[in-house]
């Protein structure tokens, strides 16, 4: 399984993501830089990591969406390649129109860096197959613009994957760190192959770091790709 980690000027979670994909998960992993182009089916998985691409000028992800590499990312998305946007990567995917909605400044206008509880509301995506529906997990967030908003929430109800919750899985206002509509922490695209989330699974993929709850996202991808491969040769 071949994976790419896209690096923009200002990315700062690319090495963490690369490490998890290559050394924890065993993916054949490569860095792809903002000026690069690639064949749309060259990779099985493309990850846009966290950071502050182009200094978050204008707004988070607004400049990165115009990087040359995003033309290749968009073509890959059209061809069904699995794409994950983590934090700033999620912001870039919304700016590029690959995911619906927008990420705005946190409701309290503060930068949040701490662990949160999340409820897996949809375990039927390529990114959540290893979780149970309704499972409560813990991951780290680190963002100032994670307040997700979309005008027509009913249109994406079945695309909501992760929601902020309390330790018991209750969706409450107090458990929402940034003001996101419906406590949304992660969503998938209409076709289901593009996933954006504000929490950082790469920071929660080894027990040494206090939690390996995020590892199941990458395990789910590996499981999905194996099943797709087996189906193709059946």
Curated annotation (Swiss-Prot):
It catalyses: N(2)-formyl-N(1)-(5-phospho-beta-D-ribosyl)glycinamide + L-glutamine + ATP + H2O = 2-formamido-N(1)-(5-O-phospho-beta-D-ribosyl)acetamidine + L-glutamate + ADP + phosphate + H(+); L-glutamine + H2O = L-glutamate + NH4(+). One of its GO terms (cellular component) is cytoplasm. Its main location: cytoplasm. It is found in: Cytoplasm. GO terms for biological process: 'de novo' IMP biosynthetic process. The active site is at 87 (nucleophile), 200, 202. Its EC number is 6.3.5.3, 3.5.1.2. It comes from the Bacteria. Residues 3-231 form the Glutamine amidotransferase type-1 domain. Signal peptide: none annotated. Gene3D superfamilies: 3.40.50.880. The keyword ATP-binding applies. GO terms for molecular function: ATP binding; glutaminase activity; phosphoribosylformylglycinamidine synthase activity. Pfam families: GATase_5. Part of the phosphoribosylformylglycinamidine synthase complex involved in the purines biosynthetic pathway. Catalyzes the ATP-dependent conversion of formylglycinamide ribonucleotide (FGAR) and glutamine to yield formylglycinamidine ribonucleotide (FGAM) and glutamate. The FGAM synthase complex is composed of three subunits. PurQ produces an ammonia molecule by converting glutamine to glutamate. PurL transfers the ammonia molecule to FGAR to form FGAM in an ATP-dependent manner. This is Phosphoribosylformylglycinamidine synthase subunit PurQ. It comes from Pseudothermotoga lettingae (strain ATCC BAA-301 / DSM 14385 / NBRC 107922 / TMO).
């Amino acid at each position: 399984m071949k994976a790419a980690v896209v690096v923009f000027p200002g990315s700062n979670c690319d090495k963490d993501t690369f490490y998890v994909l290559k050394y924890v998960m065993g993916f054949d992993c490569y860095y792809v830089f903002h000026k690069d182009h690639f064949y749309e089916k060259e990779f099985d998985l493309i990850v846009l990591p966290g950071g502050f691409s182009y200094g978050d000028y204008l707004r988070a992800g607004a400049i990165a969406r115009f990087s040359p590499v995003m033309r290749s990312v968009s073509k890959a998305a059209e061809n069904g390649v699995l794409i994950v946007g983590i934090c700033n990567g999620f912001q870039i995917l919304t700016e590029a129109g690959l995911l619906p909605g927008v990420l705005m400044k946190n409701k309290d206008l503060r930068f949040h860096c701490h662990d949160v509880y999340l409820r897996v509301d949809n375990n039927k995506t390529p990114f959540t197959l290893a979780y149970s529906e309704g499972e409560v997990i813990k991951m780290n967030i680190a963002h100032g613009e994670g307040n997700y908003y979309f005008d027509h929430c009913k249109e994406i109800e079945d695309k909501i994957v992760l929601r902020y919750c309390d330790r018991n899985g209750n969706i409450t206002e107090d458990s929402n760190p940034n003001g996101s509509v419906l406590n949304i922490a992660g969503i998938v695209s209409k076709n289901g192959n593009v996933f954006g989330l504000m929490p950082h699974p790469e920071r929660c993929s080894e027990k040494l770091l206090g939690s390996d709850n995020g590892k199941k996202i990458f395990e789910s991808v590996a499981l999905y790709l194996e099943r797709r491969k087996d189906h193709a040769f059946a």
